[in-house]
């Protein structure tokens, strides 16, 4: 039994390292292009910060998994506490970024005149700064009440209350993501003034879908199910391994989505990574007139 568990842990950590290296490369490319090569807009600022959060999140995963593989034992608890604290911070920040992207996109479609005329110029930058501060605050409170992997806090009511509070916050963000996504879908397919499909909309939709499938369930496990051990003790270890792999997949998938959407129906031999990413964030419908204009712009790059 112990040998079987050790093999499962080894395989899981190897998968995380492989996924992490792929994700690190992709997120680093996205971050570099958005920071230095592309003109930033409201949505690209969120994507830039999301790529940074995913990059650091995967880096934490790789460090923890590599130490597990090399030592074949539980790593130093102080180091793991710090690493886990940072991972929770990055996870919450990434979820907040996705929620902000979804809300911003919904406002741009539902209230286009207000969005273009009255939206403050630096809203995205201010929102990203507030998201990092809020995520840090939640993480500090969580560590204060729970101490994370320290077993002496297992029966602490303050820790349990903080877990339920954090889970309620995750559920609130889940509702925000669902409502804003459904509103966009309704605007896309229903009504007289239907929204025209753009690559930016496809990029955001696929990113949210991957997070809902791979990222959000893991948050519920980390903050809620792992604390109710009397009910979930039989499945706890398997759920933990699954949650870790799924979070790695989620952070690894975003750059792949950007480059897939950006290169779809385009000839790759004439496309640079900069052009592909720019195309993935394109918020204009691909009518024949727009296609001609975009071809001219790309030729000038």
Curated annotation (Swiss-Prot):
Tissue specificity note: Expressed in a subset of sensory neurons that includes nociceptors. Expressed in the subclass of non-peptidergic sensory neurons that are IB4(+) and VR1(-).
Transmembrane regions listed in the UniProt entry: 16-36, 43-63, 78-98, 129-149, 164-184, 204-224, 241-261
Membrane topology value: Multi-pass membrane protein
One GO cellular component term noted in the UniProt record for this chain: plasma membrane
Gene Ontology MF terms in the entry: G protein-coupled receptor activity
UniProt-listed Gene3D superfamilies: Rhodopsin 7-helix transmembrane proteins
Pfam families in UniProt: 7tm_1
Subcellular location: Cell membrane
Keywords from the UniProt entry: Cell membrane, G-protein coupled receptor, Membrane, Receptor, Transducer, Transmembrane, Transmembrane helix
Segments on the Cytoplasmic side according to the record's topology features: 37-42, 99-128, 185-203, 262-301
PROSITE patterns tied to this protein: G_PROTEIN_RECEP_F1_1, G_PROTEIN_RECEP_F1_2
Extracellular face residues: 1-15, 64-77, 150-163, 225-240
Family: Belongs to the G-protein coupled receptor 1 family. Mas subfamily.
The protein's role, per its UniProt record: Orphan receptor. May be a receptor for RFamide-family neuropeptides such as NPFF and NPAF, which are analgesic in vivo. May regulate nociceptor function and/or development, including the sensation or modulation of pain.
Protein name: Mas-related G-protein coupled receptor member A6
Species for this entry: Mus musculus (Mouse)
């Amino acid at each position: 039994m112990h040998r079987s568990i050790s093999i499962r842990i080894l395989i899981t950590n190897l998968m995380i390292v492989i996924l992490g290296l792929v994700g690190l490369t992709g997120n680093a490319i996205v971050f570099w292009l958005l920071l230095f090569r592309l003109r930033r807009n409201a949505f690209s600022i969120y994507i830039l910060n999301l790529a940074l959060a995913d990059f650091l999140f995967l880096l934490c995963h790789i460090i923890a998994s590599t130490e597990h593989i090399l030592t074949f034992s539980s790593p130093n608890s102080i180091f793991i506490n710090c690493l886990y604290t940072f991972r929770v911070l990055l996870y919450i920040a990434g979820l907040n970024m996705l929620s902000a992207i979804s809300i911003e996109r919904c406002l741009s479609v539902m209230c286009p005149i207000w969005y273009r005329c009255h939206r403050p110029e630096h809203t995205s930058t201010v929102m990203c700064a507030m998201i990092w501060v809020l995520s840090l605050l939640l993480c500090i409170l969580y560590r204060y009440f729970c101490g994370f992997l320290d077993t002496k806090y297992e029966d602490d009511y303050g820790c349990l209350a903080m877990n339920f509070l954090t889970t309620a916050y995750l559920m609130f963000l889940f509702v925000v993501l669902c409502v804003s996504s459904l509103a966009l879908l309704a605007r896309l397919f229903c009504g007289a003034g239907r929204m025209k499909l753009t690559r930016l909309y496809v990029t955001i939709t696929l990113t949210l879908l991957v997070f809902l499938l791979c990222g959000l369930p893991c948050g519920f496990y980390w903050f809620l199910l792992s604390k109710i051990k009397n009910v979930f003790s039989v499945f706890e270890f398997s759920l933990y391994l699954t949650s870790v792999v799924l979070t790695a997949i989620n952070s690894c998938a975003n750059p792949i989505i950007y480059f897939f959407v950006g290169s779809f129906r385009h000839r790759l031999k004439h496309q640079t990574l900069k052009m592909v990413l720019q195309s993935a964030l394109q918020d204009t419908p691909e009518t024949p007139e727009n296609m001609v204009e975009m071809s001219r712009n790309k030729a000038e790059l």
